[in-house]
Amino acid sequence: THEGEEFIYVLSGVVEINYGKNTYILEEGDSIYYDSIVAHHVHAAADNRARILGVVYTPY
């Protein structure tokens, strides 16, 4: 976790995002925006390859 906010856009593949106690599956063209202070982990789903565009804002 860290202060700030994040935006993730899936360019290709499938991405799994663990956010707090929730899990989200994003496919190509999907996006998500969240508060980074909540525990989170972003990874390609099912051991496949994925490409994302990530934008991270930190208040520093």
Give residue ranges: language-model regions:
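Short, conserved beta-strand element in jelly-roll/cupin
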Residues: 2-17
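Short acidic-glycine-tyrosine-enriched beta hairpin
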Residues: 20-35
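Short secondary-structure boundary/capping segments
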Residues: 7, 23-24, 44
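Ligand-binding loop in jelly-roll beta-barrel domains
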Residues: 27, 36-60
